[in-house]
Amino acid sequence: MLINKKIWVTASLCLLGVGNALAQFAAVVSPPRFELSAKPGGRLTEVVGITNNSAVQARYRMKTADWIFGADTSVTFTDTLAPESCRPWVSIESREIMAPPGRRVGFRVQVDVPPDAPPRECRFALLIEGDEQQVKNESGLSVPVAGRIGVIFYVAVDGAAPLLDITAAGVREVNGVRLPVLKVKNSGTAHGRLSAFLSGVDAKGQNLDFTPSTFPILPGETRFVELSATTRRGEVARVAYPVTVRGQIEWGDQRMPFDQSFE
């Protein structure tokens, strides 16, 4: 029987502690996120695969949480029910599971969309937490370490979709490298995620390919998206400016031509 729970958010491994924490939480989860669609009054049932890669039986605690996607692309989980959260729509199979060593178990997540739900995006994540372990650090001190994996769910209700406005936003230094940047505003009702076929020749004559970061742009947000540059051999490149970037940017079933100079 599914237990009515509260849910929302991302697919990242958060290791809290030091040392061999990964060995203490040897779980592999697939898929890392779900991007789904539903009608008002509809029901979705999905299965998350959890594989215990350790040599002993593992216990995982299952729960849900709301999340905040920070300006620095960090994710913060919270148990507090967020305004307009869709977590009351969600049920999960159990609060705890036991996974045999080397085995994959399936875990069901169910979303029941209310009949009167407006076009919107329901976002949530299943949190999978391992037992706390005492791990010795380099100084020989025992440190409590726990592992957590969050699996993102996006459910577009009644045709909810992103509406992106994309413009060139100059050049910014990212991790010591100057990269072209796009300004992306989402005035739609669902998240957007960019993909692109972009290329250009820089001031040194390098033939380069440009790829946007694939972080989500949530409804109502404006984010700056870097374009990483590689040579035709796939090697990371340092761009000599000015450079004109041309090609096509896509998100969902939408696409737009792009032709902009960066200096």
Regions found by a protein language model. Name each.
Residues 19-23:
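Sec/Tat signal peptide C-region and signal peptidase I cleavage site
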Residues 56-68, 112-154, 233-263:
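Terminal connector regions
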Residues 47-49, 93-128:
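Ligand-binding face of N-terminal immunoglobulin V-set domains in extracellular IgSF glycoproteins
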Residues 24-58, 94-96, 162-181, 214:
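Beta-sheet-dominated interaction scaffolds and their linkers
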Residues 97-105, 214-223, 254:
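Short proline/glycine- and polar residue-rich coil/turn motifs
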Residues 141-173:
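Transition segment at domain starts
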Residues 25-30, 54-108, 195-198, 202-207:
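Surface-exposed binding patches on compact interaction domains or structured appendages
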Residues 34, 46, 105-109, 223-227:
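Short strand-edge motifs at loop-to-beta-strand transitions and within beta-strands
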